[in-house]
Every structure is written in C-alpha cells, then in structure tokens.
Amino acid sequence: MTEKRKGEGDKLLYCSFCGKSQHEVRKLIAGPSVYICDECVELCNDIIREEIREISPKRDGSELPTPHEIRAHLDDYVIGQEYAKKVLAVAVYNHYKRLRNSSEAGGVELGKSNILLIGPTGSGKTLLAETLARLLDVPFTMADATTLTEAGYVGEDVENIIQKLLQKCDYDVEKAQRGIVYIDEIDKISRKSDNPSITRDVSGEGVQQALLKLIEGTIASVPPQGGRKHPQQEFLQVDTSKILFICGGAFAGLDKVIEQRSVKGTGIGFGADVKSKNARATLSENFAKVEPEDLIKYGLIPEFIGRLPVVATLTELDEAALIQILKEPKNALTKQYAALFDLEGVELEFRDDALNAIAHKAMERKTGARGLRSIVEAVLLDTMYDLPSLEGVSKVVIDETVIKGDSAPLMIYENPESQAAVSE
C-alpha cells in the first residue's frame, strides 16, 4: 500500500519500495499510483553506477599511444627537455605494453622499467610525470620522500604511498595497479655519509631499504579506509609490480661528484691537464654524464639504483626557455591569468619586454620555471585586488617597467572620459 488513512480526509503517503512514510524521508516522488523516496533513488543510482563500472570495456593495447604520440603530447605542456621526453616516452610505452601483453610474451618475463629523473629545481620533473598520467588516463599520486620513515618511526610509512594511489581511484585495486607513482625529493633520502653508521638512519638509507620491494614489485597489504583506526577491516592486496614508479630529485652537489670522477687521472704537476674555471662543464653537461657509481657516491644504495634502470637527466632552463614557458604551452602562465581576467570581462596583455623581464628575474632567483608564478602573482596582486571594484576597465597592459616595479599596470577604459579622469 502506498497510502494509508491518517484521519478523516487525510492521507499519509509511503514509499512503494522501502515502506517509509513521507515524514521519514526528505522527498517523496509520485508516479502513476506509486511513490519513491529520495533514499531509494540514491540507492538505485549506486546500483547502476556499480554495474556500469563492472561492464565498462577495458582499454586494450590498441589505445596505447606510441612513443611519438606521447612525446607530442608532452611537447604541448613542457618546453625543452627533449632527451628526457624521449626517454620517458619509450619507458612508459614499454611499461604499459608489458602490462597489456604479458600473456603473449612467449614465456619471457619482461622486466619493470622504473624511472629516475635528475634535474635542477623548476626544470619540469613533476610536470612531466603529471602530464604522462593525464595522457594515459591512469591514477596518479605524488609522494614526498622527505616525509617517509621506516615502519615504526614517526613519519609516513612507504605503504602510505599505495594508500594514496588507492584513494585517487576510489579503492579500485585493479585500476590502482595500472597507476603511476611519482616520488619527489628522492635525493633527500641519500645516505648521510659514505661509511655505514652505528646509529640508525631512519629517514635516509632506512627509507631506501623500505622502498626497494615496493618499487621492484611486491604484494602490499593496505588498509582500505581509516587505516589502523579500524584493524578489523580486511586489508587490500595490491600488486606493485604493475605500478610505474618515477623518482625525481634535484641532486644538489651531484655535478661535483661527476666532475671529480671525470677529471680523475688527468695527472698532477707540469703534465697535468688543468682546466680553467670557464672551461668547466655546466650543471646540465655534468648531469648528462651521470653513472651509477656517481649516485652510489652521492648516497643512494646500489640495490635502490638497480630498481631504477631508466635514468633521464633534465637540463637547466635558460632565459629563452622560460620565455617560451610563459607563453607557449596549452596551460601557459600568461594564458591562465588572461583567462582569469577574462572572467571579469577584461583583456590582459603581456608585452614582450615584460616576458623578458619576468624570465630574467626568475633566472636571478635560480628557481627555474617554478618561480615564474610567484613573480607574476606579485606583479598582478594590486590589479586583481582593485579590478572587481572598478567599472569600465576593458584592458590591462603589463610591460617591463611594471615588472621592475617602476610603474603600475596600464588600465585602458571603455569610456575615454573615465580614462582621462584616472590619468588626472
């Protein structure tokens, strides 16, 4: 029964599915002689969503982009770093080809190609990893190696990395096993000295040891939701051998280690090949010559380096590259701020000399591409503060003098009279 007599002439309506009265639910929707409540509608939605997810076709190998297509996609978002893009494109293509065709490898077990990115701050390491995950439509998570400690110590366990990945895909284990994990600041967990210490290094070599199995491939037991607060819950079993791990770091000081190895054996005394300060290799040139022995000397243990067979080095960005980054990528900084101003109905123009000045300032700060946003944000702060309160502004122009702090941005008004009043 969907209705019952409450009193004379009054009808109390009930949900035809769960039997709850109209007073027990938020909304009761009427149909031809039937009613359904909002709770039952929500339950039906959940059931349909679950069924669609189960029957949705899996991506097959034919959808995997080729290395050329991967590289082309990276070009849309990342300026420069041609060698790193090529290395990443091949490594990622081989990794996912291995996953999709593991049964057809003719009994040959294909090895895992985890990646180590070495490059200065702001050179695009994180952006490359994020762009890859977006292209491949796979779960992606970032972890900071500096927060990791061995199990049992204050800090994050390495298993938390997999838990973060699961959270990104609503704890769908199958989906998580095809994901990408980017571990940043990997150079910060290098061994504190060349000689093993008696005291325990829980945030350096200890973390490297803990990451070994995870990166190589193991069955990680991860609590579903709530972690250790709900020990009665069954743990999820995640096979990390299918997850692509990309580790990145600035490796400050590694160039000196490489240089020491390169000049070793050049002799001493009158016959020595002494290089002048100007003749020394640049940071990018040194990074390009990196060998596993250099990383071991830097503080990474040999077993850990062995788990990261693909090494891609990124070059320092020069002023010309920073100018390109400001205006060329699909999500370029100038395009982002132009879109932001467009929401106010105002056109934003950056003149070429302004872009040169921004890039020059970022080079002086030695922050790479990462420092560009803070410079632009500081320059536009007052304008973004005042603009919503001003009427009739049609365009804002930024030139070199604005970046240097010698003048305010030029505001152009729709009405010439308003422009004249402001000038006065």
From Swiss-Prot:
Superkingdom, according to UniProt? Bacteria
User: GO biological process: what's one of them?
Assistant: proteolysis involved in protein catabolic process
Q: Does the keyword Nucleotide-binding apply?
A: yes
How does this chain assemble?
Component of the ClpX-ClpP complex. Forms a hexameric ring that, in the presence of ATP, binds to fourteen ClpP subunits assembled into a disk-like structure with a central cavity, resembling the structure of eukaryotic proteasomes.
- Gene name, per UniProt, is clpX
Q: Which keywords does this Swiss-Prot/TrEMBL entry list?
A: ATP-binding, Chaperone, Metal-binding, Nucleotide-binding, Zinc
Keyword check for Heme = no
Residue intervals of the ClpX-type ZB domain = 3-56
Read off the PANTHER family from this record.
Answer: ATP-DEPENDENT CLP PROTEASE ATP-BINDING SUBUNIT CLPX-LIKE, MITOCHONDRIAL (PTHR48102:SF7), ATP-DEPENDENT CLP PROTEASE ATP-BINDING SUBUNIT CLPX-LIKE, MITOCHONDRIAL-RELATED (PTHR48102)
GO annotation, cellular component aspect: HslUV protease complex
Q: What is this protein called?
A: ATP-dependent Clp protease ATP-binding subunit ClpX
